[in-house]
């Protein structure tokens, strides 16, 4: 796997940043989480005047072999249908990107459909979906490396345009299944506590999903008695998920603000942090969604989401919805007057 050189944020400016925030014309701490966000963005950028230049959103698409086991209520073809819909501007992700000024890149990493001639989709297809991890590894080590490379390449394209804040999303029917398994493995949490309804499974559907994933885990443990850190990632992950991990790590390496979306992207963030713990410094965990286990996964990392809106769409939509709060935090530290300039008595 590619090596990333990700340093912890430089905290030498922390005292100066805090002093600037505390001297804004407001009671100390009165803007709550906005002050915390302003501190984090300032530390990431090593600046007393942070900015959110050229926000970009990467949406990676891929299909999953495990879908063949009936673990999702949505049929496989919804992945490619939605990918095409995104090119027409008709998805939830399109609306929020337009609303908040994000440049959207739609990337086919492993959709089980030929999208090579579809205008608006970047073709980086590694294979037409992963293998079925109920019986074997979802991808080879070479395919894993390719997916990481795709994520890095797409992040680099954004960076070349001056991007300072990167949001990452996904489209892939059945990708809650590998996310649930990663949560169980990485958090040492019973699998049953990690499985939810996904796109809308009923109780019998959830039970079937549990049985399939439980057998897949048993098979994995027998096939991989001495796993490396990347073994569970390539064994269960989707191409779109591994590409997302690559993009997150590359963005952290280059000191970008990285917005983490819902259950699937949080699972990818957990995976990225397991490989490079310092990557967490660059991540803002934007919301806690409605998918079973999302809150617990956030708690595993000590992450404090900004919003609780009951979202479970994916695509990066929750992270995009949160962006105005992050923008407000940056505007606060840059545009709000301080006590001296406003000629207001500092009363603390």
Where are these regions (language model features)?
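N-terminal loops that bind phosphate or other acidic moieties
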Residues: 1-348
């Amino acid at each position: 796997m590619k090596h990333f050189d990700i340093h912890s944020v430089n905290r030498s400016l922390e005292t100066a940043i805090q002093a600037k925030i505390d001297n804004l014309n407001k009671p100390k701490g009165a803007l709550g989480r906005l002050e915390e966000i302003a501190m984090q963005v300032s530390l990431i950028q090593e600046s007393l005047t942070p900015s959110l230049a050229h926000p970009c959103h990467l949406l990676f698409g891929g299909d999953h072999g495990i879908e063949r086991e009936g673990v999702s209520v949505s049929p496989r073809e919804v992945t490619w249908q939605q990918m095409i819909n995104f090119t027409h501007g008709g998805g939830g992700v399109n609306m929020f990107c337009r609303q908040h000024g994000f440049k959207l890149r739609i990337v086919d990493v492993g959709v089980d459909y030929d999208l090579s001639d579809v205008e608006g989709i970047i073709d980086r297809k590694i294979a037409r979906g992963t293998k079925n991890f109920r019986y074997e590894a979802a991808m080879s080590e070479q395919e894993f490396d390719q997916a990481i490379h795709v994520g890095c390449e797409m992040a680099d394209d954004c960076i070349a345009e001056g991007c300072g804040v990167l949001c990452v999303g996904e489209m892939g029917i059945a990708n809650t299944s590998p996310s649930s398994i990663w949560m169980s493995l990485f958090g040492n949490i019973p699998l049953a506590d990690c499985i939810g309804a996904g796109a809308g499974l009923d109780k019998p559907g959830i039970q079937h999903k549990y049985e399939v994933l439980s057998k897949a885990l048993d098979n994995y443990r027998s096939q991989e008695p001495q796993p490396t850190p990347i073994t569970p990632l390539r064994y269960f992950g989707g191409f779109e998920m591994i590409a997302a991990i690559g993009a997150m790590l590359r963005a952290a390496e280059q000191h970008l603000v990285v917005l983490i979306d819902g259950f699937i992207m949080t699972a990818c963030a957990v995976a990225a942090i397991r490989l490079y713990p310092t990557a967490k410094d660059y991540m803002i965990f934007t919301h806690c969604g409605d998918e079973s286990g999302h809150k617990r996964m956030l708690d595993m990392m000590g992450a404090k989401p900004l919003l609780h809106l009951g979202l479970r769409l994916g695509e990066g939509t929750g992270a995009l919805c949160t962006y105005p709060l992050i923008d407000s935090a940056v505007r606060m530290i840059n545009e709000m007057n301080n006590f001296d300039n406003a000629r207001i008595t500092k009363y603390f």
